[in-house]
From Swiss-Prot:
Gene3D superfamilies: HUPs (3.40.50.620). It catalyses: (R)-4'-phosphopantetheine + ATP + H(+) = 3'-dephospho-CoA + diphosphate. Substrate binds at residues 10, 42, 74, 88. Belongs to the bacterial CoaD family. This is Phosphopantetheine adenylyltransferase. Reversibly transfers an adenylyl group from ATP to 4'-phosphopantetheine, yielding dephospho-CoA (dPCoA) and pyrophosphate. One of its GO terms (cellular component) is cytoplasm. Homohexamer. Its cofactor is Mg(2+). The gene is coaD. GO terms for molecular function: ATP binding; pantetheine-phosphate adenylyltransferase activity. Pathway: Cofactor biosynthesis; coenzyme A biosynthesis; CoA from (R)-pantothenate: step 4/5. It is an enzyme of class 2 (transferase).
Length: 150
């Protein structure tokens, strides 16, 4: 049986920190699905159709990474995708507190789904999508935070 993992998020935008988590997870899994959650109630800064090719360009030489969009529960998407693992990056203890409770809820929804926590690389730990959106909104240079040009 292949080890398939999903790395879910809004990825608004997909950062160098996200890319680092995916690349570091590749030796652990046969396939990693970057799962972009499409929440109709959440106003995105960058449109999903704009972000998908940007993310795909980061992994164009990697054959075991896919980018998919999903609606609904992450645990259900994992099950539908045949994924047994869910990857989450942790920058700090605040992230852990939040992600731990989400992990427990996902386990309740699907008992076979295991969450794998990966500590963010120290040089990227300060990067967040919301920080990038704030800087970009005021025409600041965000090139050092993103693995692609916007």
């Amino acid at each position: 049986m292949s080890k398939i993992a999903i790395f879910p998020g809004s990825f608004d935008p997909f950062t160098k920190g996200h890319e680092d988590i995916v690349r570091r997870s590749l030796p652990l899994f046969d396939k990693v699905i970057i799962a972009i959650g499409n929440n109709a109630q959440k106003n995105r800064y960058f449109e999903i159709d704009y972000i998908i090719p940007k993310i795909e360009s980061c992994f164009e030489k990697t054959d075991n990474v896919e980018v998919k969009v999903f609606k609904g529960l992450t645990a259900e998407f994992a099950k539908e995708s045949g994924a047994q693992f869910l990857i989450r990056g942790l920058r700090n203890t605040t992230d852990f507190e939040y992600e731990n409770s989400i992990s427990q809820a996902n386990k309740y929804l699907w008992k076979d789904l295991e969450t794998v926590f990966m500590i963010t690389s120290p040089h990227l730990a300060y990067i967040s999508s919301s920080l990038i959106r704030d800087i970009h909104k005021y025409d600041g240079d965000v090139s050092g935070f993103l693995p692609y040009k916007i």
